[in-house]
Amino acid sequence: YKTGLGAELTVGNLASMSSGMEWSEKYYSIINITTESYFTDDLRSLILNQKIINKPGQKFRYSSGDTQLLGMVIEKATNTNLSDYLKNNFTIPMGFENEALWQLDSEESGIEKAYCCFASNAKDFARFGKLYKNNGKWNNEILLDSTFINKAINPVYEDSPYYGYGWWLYTFEDKKVFTMNGHRGQFVIVFPEEGIIIVRLGDKNKEGDNDDGDLYKYISEGYNLATSIE
């Protein structure tokens, strides 16, 4: 974006989902930008045609489009695709036991769906939680700057104290908790001060369950289980 409100857009706005992009986050509507993003074979063009309609950096508004544009910015800045960037800078240094899979929009376009569809196993997902718990360090190697980590796991805006940079923020019995929330009940849950990391993979417990309701069950049960076996 070279002109208009988009010219004010920063990487931090994208990471905190406050870009002001024209985007409606509806998953089950046939005619909707989010639905289209899952089925298009040219995700790059779809995102670049979205307008910035509100002043960036004002408030949090959940938007898969923000995350996708952020992924495209990283791709442009590093001159490599997201899969290779993640592999070379994170999964290999962190010793992933299995190769992760990332869904593309199409073989021809070859762009990763940055907002979703990254598949791995519980143990390897937990490594991301550990990286953030350790302020970006892995075996004394700095993979992420600690200043960025601090911003990621703390609220960006007062009126949305539940979101930082890509992480959801909670408290449990006065303990700080930050989580990665995936589709249909997949979570990475981190208690940074207690050093507890919980990963839950799978589908929702039953039709009609609320993601947040399920999450609080996993936080409570996981914490109680972890502390009972110490």
Model-based region annotation:
Residues 1-21, 49-51, 78-115, 120:
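Active-site helix/loop module of the DD-peptidase/beta-lactamase fold
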Residues 14, 47, 60-90, 125-131, ...:
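Alpha-helical scaffold elements that line and support the substrate/ligand-binding pocket
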